[in-house]
Every structure is written in C-alpha cells, then in structure tokens.
C-alpha cells in the first residue's frame, strides 16, 4: 500500500512518512481488555423505543445507506440522557440524528474535494442549528436537509430557555470548527502536537455540546456563577477529555482503515512517542484512567454553591451520566463495527 507522508511544523519533529499497511497489520493484535469506565449510564426504555419513528422520518429525506449508519441512536440518547421526559427525549433523539447525518455529509470525499461546497454546508448547518431565517433557495442541493431540520430546532428553541439555546448554538459552532481542524490535518498537512490535539478535541468530541443538552434533558439551567467556577470549568474540560479518549479508542480500527489520523493514539505513534500502536493504546488508556481519578477527586473537592448547590449537583450527575452513556454506547454500537475486539462489543 502506498505510503502516506506526514509533515511536522514543530522544531523537535522531523519530516516523516507512515505506511498505512503497517498500521493495518498491527490492528488484529491490539489488546483492549484493560479498558473500562468508572462512570455508569442509565437507560430510558421510552426514549429507546422512539428510535424507529425517528429513523423512519430521516429516511424520508436521506439515502437509506446513510440512515442505516444511525442504528441504535435511540440507545445512545437513552443512555446519555436517561432522565429526559418523553417530549425532550424525542427532541434530543432528533438532534442526534441531525448531528450524525450532517457529520457524515461533511465526511463525504466528494464534498471535501470541493472546498466551496464544504464551506457552504457548514454555514447552512450553523443557520439550521440557530433556527435562523434565510432564503432557502440559496441552498437547493440541501433542500431535504433544511426540511428535515426546521421542525427539530424550532421545537428545541421553544422548549429551551433563550440562554441555553444560544449556548447550544455557540458550542455547536465550536464543534464545527473542530471538524474543520480535523479535515485540515489529512496528509500531506502537518500533524499537530499532543497538547493541541487534546485542547481542540475537547470541542471535536462533542462533549461540550452534549453537556448543554444534559441541562436541557434535566430541565435545569446552570447559573453562570456555577459554570464559571474554575473547579467546574476544569471538571467540564476533563469530562470532555474523557469522552475524547473513549471516542479515539473505540473508533481506532475504523479510522486506521479509513486513513484518518485525527486520533490521540495515532498522534502518539506517528510522533514517535510510542513504538507501537499497542503502546499508544496503553498510553491513552492510562491517560484516561488518570483523568477519571482527577474527575472523581475534583467532584469531591468542589465547594458548596449555596442556593445553587442542588442545580450544581444535578449538573455534575448529568455530565457523568453522559460520559458513562457515551462509553457504553460506543462499546456496543455497530458504527464502530470494525473494532470487534473492543470490550463488550456485540460483534
């Protein structure tokens, strides 16, 4: 298989190339048995049962093969937001279907080859998320996406407070910028250092978006005095790191086979920090365990927030359930079907 060149802009890193086949050869020998989560998820059977209706609706607007990739979306939302009411659970499920559909659209090679169309779709996604009014005739190629999305974000805006709705839109914009960054590091562009990867992937993991939706799911709104507390901000950053590590571990095999290098495990290996993919997996699992310990310690050390303390505790609970729900879903999802050796995988 043809070698792919990866260039480094950092003075300590020399130009190098990597052989995708060499990475593929290591995949069957990887051991993930030491990969577990300290955080548990709940499960809302009512939300899970809504999946069929949500996907049937999506199938009216998108190709069958794209909708098929959304299998077990109900399971994801049911685990991450298990305390949501039926009404809010249905909205959350639709938002996740939208997010996965648009993410897959942005990943299509034919779209990436046409930079103008790629940017146009990104702008449209933001307009839809913000529930903005705009001349829909300017986007004839995305008419189905617009028709599908309008009811979702209209209902979300009606149910959410104005502050929470705008915070969601802001975090979604940050997420899309992360997606843009991910696209920029494909060969032959430079592969970033680990710290850059870590900070950007806090947005790219979707954790910050999910944490706003966690408030929505529990019908709370966390006051700025709580969210702005340094300890709470660090807690949210570490929780995003954890979600990012989980996504990287579970998606590793799929990303190697797809030629995607935006993965902490691959960054460690390609930078020469570890000598094998297994060593890189072990390093990320260790980083993950360390992050879990930091989160647990931080939760125990957070101060009381006076009259806002009950909301703060509910927020912490909602976020840890998001983490646990994401882990459990990733371990079972057919979306990562090539990663059959991962713990608890159905395949």
From Swiss-Prot:
Sorted UniProt keywords: Lyase, Magnesium, Metal-binding
EC number of the protein: 4.2.3.-
Motif extent (D(D/E)XX(D/E) motif): 103-107
InterPro entries: Isoprenoid_synthase_dom_sf, Terpene_cyclase-like_2
Site feature: Plays a critical role in the stabilization of intermediate cation: 100
MF terms (GO), sorted A to Z: metal ion binding; terpene synthase activity
Record GO biological process: terpene biosynthetic process
Binding site for Mg(2+) 3: 247, 251, 255
Pfam family membership, one: Terpene_syn_C_2
Amino-acid positions noted as binding Mg(2+) 2 in the UniProt annotation, renumbered to this chain: 103
Cofactor(s) the record lists: Mg(2+)
Segments carrying motif WxxxxxRY motif: 329-336
Chain location of the short sequence motif NSE motif per the record: 247-255
Top-level taxonomic group: Eukaryota
UniProt keyword DNA-binding present: no
Described purpose of this protein according to its UniProt entry: Terpene synthase that may be involved in the production of volatile terpenoids. Does not show detectable terpene products with either farnesyl diphosphate (FPP) or geranyl diphosphate (GPP). P.polycephalum has a unique biology and these volatile terpenoids could function in internal communication of P.polycephalum, to mark the territory that have been explored, or they may be involved in chemotaxis.
Domain notes: The 2 conserved active-site motifs D(D/E)XX(D/E) and NSE are required for coordinating the divalent metal ions that stabilize the PPi moiety of the substrate. The C-terminal WxxxxxRY motif is frequently found in terpene synthases and is important to guide product formation.
Protein family: Belongs to the terpene synthase family.
Entries under PANTHER family matching the protein: BETA-PINACENE SYNTHASE-RELATED (PTHR35201:SF4), TERPENE SYNTHASE (PTHR35201)
Protein name (database record): Terpene synthase 2
Organism encoding this protein: Physarum polycephalum (Slime mold)
Gene encoding the protein: TPS2
């Amino acid at each position: 298989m043809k070698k792919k060149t990866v260039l480094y802009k950092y003075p300590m890193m020399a130009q190098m190339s990597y052989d995708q086949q060499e990475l593929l050869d290591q995949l069957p020998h990887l051991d993930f048995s030491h990969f577990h989560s300290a955080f548990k998820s709940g499960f809302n059977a009512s939300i899970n049962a809504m999946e069929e209706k949500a996907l049937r609706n999506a199938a009216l607007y998108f190709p069958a093969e794209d909708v098929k990739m959304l299998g077990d979306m109900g399971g994801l939302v049911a685990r991450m937001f298990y305390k949501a009411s039926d009404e809010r659970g249905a909205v959350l499920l639709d938002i996740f279907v939208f997010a996965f559909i648009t993410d897959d659209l942005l990943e299509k090679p034919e779209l990436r080859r046409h930079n103008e169309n790629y940017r146009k779709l990104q702008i449209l996604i933001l307009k839809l998320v913000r529930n903005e009014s705009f001349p829909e005739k300017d986007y004839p190629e995305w008419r189905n996406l617009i028709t599908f999305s309008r009811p979702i974000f209209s209902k979300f805006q009606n149910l959410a407070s104005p502050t929470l709705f705008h915070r969601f839109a802001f975090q979604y914009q940050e997420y899309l910028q992360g997606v843009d960054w991910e696209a920029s590091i494909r060969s032959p562009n430079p592969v970033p250092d680990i710290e850059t990867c870590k900070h950007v992937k806090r947005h790219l993991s979707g954790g910050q978006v999910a944490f706003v939706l966690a408030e929505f799911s529990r019908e709370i709104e966390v006051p700025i005095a709580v969210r702005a507390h340094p300890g709470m901000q660090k807690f949210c950053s570490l929780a995003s790191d954890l979600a990012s590590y989980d996504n990287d571990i579970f998606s590793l095999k799929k990303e190697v086979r797809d030629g995607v290098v935006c993965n902490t495990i691959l960054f460690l290996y390609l930078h020469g920090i570890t000598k094998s993919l297994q060593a890189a997996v072990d390093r990320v699992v260790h980083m993950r365990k360390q992050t879990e310990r930091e989160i647990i310690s931080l939760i125990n050390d957070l101060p009381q927030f006076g009259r806002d303390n009950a909301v703060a505790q509910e927020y912490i609970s909602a976020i840890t359930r998001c983490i646990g729900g994401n882990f459990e879903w990733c371990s079972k999802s057919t979306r990562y079907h090539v990663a059959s050796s991962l713990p608890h995988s159905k395949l």
